[in-house]
């Protein structure tokens, strides 16, 4: 019997252990940030241990970084975490993409942009959206602080191999419908736990026709489906993206291995989901987890349980309403899900020559300094600012209430991020997950509209 893509990468990295039992995996790349690394570094100090592979460990600052004045950090805890990582990187010989450096940004942007993220690697980070890197054909997953310390000390992790789930996606995406809509629809249809215990492999003609940035959007939200891993077969689109990037120095010698990274025709999948996106609509979440969403033309559903009732109460909405009925106050274009150059370009087409609605506060936060520079070279910063958007410095920003960028209590926000939990964007904030184009259109119109009518 053949092997899946996941099987091939997993098998190559097993150092010890039998199938069906926890196995010791070698870790090729460890990405770290300021929030989940301090205790792990301190653990090394207490045990008088060195960092096993500082050359495979890379740090960036993202979660706590202010996006207005990056060098004026007013929050004491945020400042402490940032300065602690800077000192730890110095003490342990870790390369850091520091504040103001050309490569600094959200960790899941920095890895791909620098060429650190490559097909066939095992990649870990103390962040739940690490599956983003799986878009390259890597096994990438989030880990906790104790596991961060374990990788620091040994460059290995004990893991139990998951089952394989294939999500076969075909059809041409309609105008105004994007990768974000695909993953939101899947979660809405199958729930926030359908991927639990599985590695999700996204396949099909639709996936093959997506850019690398769109592929990353889908893998980014695998965790919102309950899956630790989400990945895609690397192909010419992948190779062309990686080629020439600073840390992709072994590109030519790696190609033979990379071209073997596909699921064999007779590979066994424990479960298969089929999706035709030909008639897919823009998606909007109405509740307090990503499963609580609807296609744009559909009304919000009836209350089925106590969770639905709590979500409606928190969001100030009720069954039967539609997305266009939501009174928006904020729009956030950013996060590791949708703050790449293509996201900003797509959004810019909607707002060109328009003005942000007077009831809306709209901010754009490029996911990295690389994206910011490239966008500014195209004049996107001027376009957004002329329309009334705030143009910020890179960081996680309003994706989570861990920095100064927060949505006021009771206010509805159209957000291109990945989570709409209670309080995720600030105490009492009401988050609606959408694509960048949906968010941009909402900023101009003061409400959600069907972008299929305005995107050509």
UniProtKB/Swiss-Prot annotation:
Keyword Iron-sulfur: yes
InterPro entries linked: 3-IsopropMal_deHydase_lsu, Acnase/IPM_dHydase_lsu_aba_1/3, Acoase/IPM_deHydtase_lsu_aba, Aconitase_4Fe-4S_BS, Aconitase_4Fe-4S_dom, IPM_dehydratase_rel_enz, IPMI_cat
Reaction catalysed by this enzyme: (2R,3S)-3-isopropylmalate = (2S)-2-isopropylmalate
UniProt-listed Enzyme Commission number(s): 4.2.1.33
Cofactor(s) needed: [4Fe-4S] cluster
Alphabetized CDD domains for the sequence: IPMI
Subunit structure: Heterodimer of LeuC and LeuD.
Function: Catalyzes the isomerization between 2-isopropylmalate and 3-isopropylmalate, via the formation of 2-isopropylmaleate.
Entry-linked SUPFAM superfamilies: Aconitase iron-sulfur domain
GO BP field: L-leucine biosynthetic process
Cofactor note: Binds 1 [4Fe-4S] cluster per subunit.
Name recorded for this polypeptide: 3-isopropylmalate dehydratase large subunit
Protein's pathway: Amino-acid biosynthesis; L-leucine biosynthesis; L-leucine from 3-methyl-2-oxobutanoate: step 2/4
